[in-house]
Amino acid sequence: MKTHHLKIWPQWFDAIRLGSKSYEIRYDDRGFNVGDRLVLEEFKAGVGEYTGRTIEKRVVYISRGDDAEAFGGLREGYAVLGIGPCA
């Protein structure tokens, strides 16, 4: 299992924090695997700075754009990461 530190914009950070968003769509350049820990670090892109707020989640499911089972519309090289609480 790996730990991945990822920037996340405020609107997506809050949706995950409030429980209304349970996935992340990411460029799959890190070798994500089920069981990996994500440290989501809130980042204000327009200002170019971190806010200091973080959320930790666990990858519970992965659908990759280059998998035969992946739904149409997901670009090759990207992945949908189903995320859940860290145990």
Protein language model annotation of sequence segments:
Residues 26-29, 84-86:
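A structural micro-motif recognizing beta-strand termini
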Residues 28-29, 43-48:
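Short, charged beta-turn/beta-strand-edge "cap" motif at the junction between a beta-strand
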